[in-house]
Amino acid sequence: MALDRSIISKTTWYSVVLWMMVVLVRVHGAAARPNRKEWDSVIKLPTEPVDADSDEVGTRWAVLVAGSNGYGNYRHQADVCHAYQLLIKGGLKEENIVVFMYDDIATNELNPRHGVIINHPEGEDLYAGVPKDYTGDNVTTENLFAVILGDKSKLKGGSGKVINSKPEDRIFIYYSDHGGPGILGMPNMPYLYAMDFIDVLKKKHASGSYKEMVIYVEACESGSVFEGIMPKDLNIYVTTASNAQENSWGTYCPGMDPSPPPEYITCLGDLYSVAWMEDSEAHNLKRESVKQQYKSVKQRTSNFNNYAMGSHVMQYGDTNITAEKLYLYQGFDPATVNFPPQNGRLETKMEVVNQRDAELFLLWQMYQRSNHQSENKTDILKQIAETVKHRKHIDGSVELIGVLLYGPGKGSSVLQSVRAPGSSLVDDWTCLKSMVRVFETHCGTLTQYGMKHMRAFANICNSGVSEASMEEACLAACEGYNAGLFHPSNRGYSA
């Protein structure tokens, strides 16, 4: 039967022709590509819904946390700004994204592009438009917990924005900073302790105010925050940049491959963080599952099985969530609708810097680029010397405390012992905090470098040492030491 074009509008005629072309393409390709999911996206229009059986119900919420400050930690705020822009492109609303960042990077005098933050050597500005919900002194563990729980009464400062989620909503939490066994750093003391965080997640679950939650954590020893204590029945899935015993890594650093623009003297990103975000940007998140991203990020963060310059990405909690599509948490960018499954897969190793050394890395870059005779060069050298001195003091003090508590033959082995996989770091988290406070009172603040000794304090608790004995050992180990700016009276206690 012929179609009478005279009775059909031009727009309708074009629609009919387009429909016929689509049918022909489908018929022609059906035999060669019988799996619908393999070929449907090739002929879809950007405005066409991708999944007819979508499980999308409720609101997507997100909490993004950069847990550090200082230009040497540029990459953490860059990670968070990148995550924000990715979620906005995915359709999440600003009112449903809560951002924690100190906000001392974009306008820092060391930033060669004033007011701009990038997360990739060829990246665009990620800072513009990022909401300043909790900045400066308001980036605290207490505020973070209040935001997650939706408890405005516990907030101190900030925008007042919280996760006011409902039972059908999904939540995505992303954290980037330094860490140590059982802890995550924050720019204002105290640090975030693992059991406190787990307790908050349990409270959130008990409130019945979300359907499912996905958490990504970038930090050294980040697996220890969940290992042995993360329940599987909270409808929460977690991946971490590293296992319970290893470092995570900064990348896109000066003098390395890939390198940032030559005017930059600090690392732009972190290996795990850029791995998951660049993966999300390169894929149709209505097609890619949480599990697929986990596998991709795991491979890239290992630096393709080069664990001397990479780490083991771990997963905890409810792994049933891994079957779901990523868009349920990160949203969907229509521009990615036709991206093929293997789009953007990197197969090359990346040069990296140990997260704990990034601060010294910045100082060394500053020293190298200073004028040979400048007073500034001398000041930088003093900063390097002071930083190294305090690191040696922390390392030496912890080692000596082990000797005083257990004897010269056992001290080191007890403090460095690692529990069996799947075990929690410590039995008594209150004891852990107490031991840290005793140490910091007499020996100075741990700092982001000293976080690595948290396992030693955990083992002191696990072996039954009393607080009085710990006090005595710390007094003997650090007697006469002037912590100066590193004293907790200046920085606060990390516990």
UniProtKB/Swiss-Prot annotation:
InterPro entries linked to this entry: AE, Legum_prodom, Legumain_prodom_sf, Peptidase_C13
Keywords: Disulfide bond, Glycoprotein, Hydrolase, Protease, Signal, Thiol protease
Swiss-Prot/TrEMBL site (Required for post-translational maturation and enzyme activity) positions: 267
Top-rank taxon, per record: Eukaryota
Pfam families attached to this UniProt entry: Legum_prodom, Peptidase_C13
GO biological process: proteolysis involved in protein catabolic process; vacuolar protein processing
The protein's enzyme class: hydrolase
Signal peptide: 1-32
GO molecular function: cysteine-type endopeptidase activity
CDD domains in the cross-refs: legumain_C
Record carries keyword GTP-binding: no
A cellular component annotation (GO) from this entry: vacuole
Residues modified by glycosylation: 138, 320, 376
Disulfide linkage: 253-267, 431-461, 443-478
Residues at the catalytic site: 178, 220
Listed EC numbers: 3.4.22.-
Family in the record: Belongs to the peptidase C13 family.
Function recorded in the entry: Asparagine-specific endopeptidase involved in the processing of vacuolar seed protein precursors into the mature forms.
Protein known as: Vacuolar-processing enzyme
Taxon lineage: Eukaryota, Viridiplantae, Streptophyta, Embryophyta, Tracheophyta
